[in-house]
Amino acid sequence: MSAEPNNNQAKADVPEEVVEPKPTTVEEPKSTTVEEPKSTTVEESKSTTVEEPKSTTAEQPKSTIEQDPKPSTTESSPVQIDDSTPIPQITTEEPKPTVAEPSTTESVTAEPTTEQPQEAAVKLESVKEADAEAAAKLEATKDADVEKAASTSQHSVSFDKATKTHDGSPLSKFYSELPAILEAAEYNEMWGIVLDPSETHVQTSIVLEKFLRANAKDVPKAKAQLIEALKWRKTMQPQKLLESTEFDKVKFGNLGYVTSYNTTEGGKEVITWNIYGAVKDVKKTFSDVPEFLKWRAALMELSIKELDLASATEKIPENGPDPYRMIQVHDYLNVSFLRMDPSIRAASKETIQTFSMAYPELLKEKFFVNVPLVMGWVFTAMKIFLSADTIKKFHPLSYGSNLGSEIPNVAEQLPKEYGGKGGELKSGLTVKYSEGEASKTA
């Protein structure tokens, strides 16, 4: 920045005029344009000289100002500098070079120089060329900085879009939350799978993908549900219920089965059967809700064991169909909908709430068979209030024999009462039973 000197004081960054020994008016060629040096130090002395501009590197000059020297008459008396001459202001990003400023108490007198006008013109032209070269370098530096800034900005945007975690997908983000989830739950087993934070662990990815889909890919909601499900498993220990607990045969015998069938496409269809018409004493079966829930959880674990998730070798496609699901069949033959016992409602409500939390996205389709015609309208009316995804999974059937037409890829293997040619349902898998009045753990 230029300092404001006294009227009798020469200003910095203004080239001195070149004069003959005698007071003579020297006119510079009007066609000559001299560009002001970017950073020039003018030293004040008794004999004023114009120094070559020092090499100064600036990153981004705001502007380049050229100034034509005006003809002036120099006398032997002190030179008077026109205060109206504009002083170019140069702003750079680098620290400004220090300019030696004249003392406020000293007046500067320009003395005649012996240089010829042509020599001065050559020197000025040399200064001009040096300035042009410096300007070109500065422009190149500016372009490089702009390109670098653009590259940095693009990288930042890409990083934000990537959600700042792994590859940016909801599943990848869910993986990054898994260590904290396991620590919060103080448990790491889900459906026979020991959860592993490594993204290459196929079985863990299946579990996480199911919890994500149950929450519309909302990671915080899926995280909260997974923590709750892990805590529930830690307390309930459903695998031990399947392996070690003998349930009361009087209460739960013939109430639930699991079957597996090879499909015509080369896969496997797992079906869980709930035969509510087999209940002999409603109050005994449903009045103890915690006991009923344990029995139902053990049957569900048996179904998952048939799915064999722990040995799966392929992940669920991110936006593709889930091959790791089962079919459920609820048979209401001989069940009265008009005289529904409150204990049945309580047990059903608790089961629905618990299973939706602890076993998300394991249901492929659910068939309600042998539903009385008089109650068929209820399921039709439900379609008005249920989501499209839920409606696709629920199928009320008035007759059990119609089930085979709903599952054509395994129809012939189904029991005869369900439209197939297979063996009796009692030949299917079930939980352990005791002959006593209460369930007991072996």
UniProtKB/Swiss-Prot annotation:
GO biological process: Golgi to plasma membrane protein transport; regulation of exocytosis
Sequence ranges of Polar residues compositional bias: 1-10, 58-92, 101-117
Matches recorded under SUPFAM superfamilies: CRAL/TRIO domain (SSF52087), CRAL/TRIO N-terminal domain (SSF46938)
Residue ranges of the region described as Disordered: 1-119, 141-170
Biased amino acid composition, Basic and acidic residues: 25-54
Domain CRAL-TRIO residues, every copy: 251-426
Family, similarity comment: Belongs to the SFH5 family.
Protein known as: Phosphatidylinositol transfer protein sfh5
Species of provenance: Botryotinia fuckeliana (strain B05.10) (Noble rot fungus)
Gene: sfh5
